[in-house]
Amino acid sequence: YTAQSSGTRDVIEWVMLHNLSGVEFNVYGVHLKASSGSSNANQRLQETTILRNHLNNLAPNFFIVGGDFNIYSNNSSSEPAFDMLTSSSDDNDGQMFDPINRIGHWHNNSSYSDVHTQSPRTSSFGGGANGGMDDRFDWLFVSQSILDQDSPMQYVEGTYWAVGNDGNHFNDAINDGNNNSVS
């Protein structure tokens, strides 16, 4: 499922087997269009629409989607891609859920500092983003079936972690001073 013919970015799919339950599940890696602005947000919507339609057609419905979504907020008017991923629709088989239920106004909000993944630096070099840790661009979403209590394959509470982030670097570089997550 890697090729998206509409000129958008590819999505990588792995089909895996959960050894304990025998459940076959799909894992997807994404890197959606970067940068702010309506044209970039519209491309993210196009990319997530293709993904959601693909997930709606899965059977059975066990999946994990992770990667750099580059989504700046959950505001449907400025970032309709987030709604495409997480909102209820006529077909909810492909609806995605945040297993830690930390959806809200994460941009530049210290209450979300433990899940921020961008930007790990405050100065610009090599073409990358700067500004310090103040956005949640990297996510792991799961299908409803993985969250169900009676499911043969379940999310294990407390295992979601923004790797390298100790929650103490809001608007700072991730390596500014001590970092209790990696040291």
Residue ranges and their predicted role:
Residues Q4, S21, L32-G37, F69-N74, ...:
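Solvent-exposed loop/turn segments at secondary-structure junctions
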Residues V11, L45-T48, R52, F82, ...:
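Extracytoplasmic/secreted envelope proteins and their assembly/folding machinery
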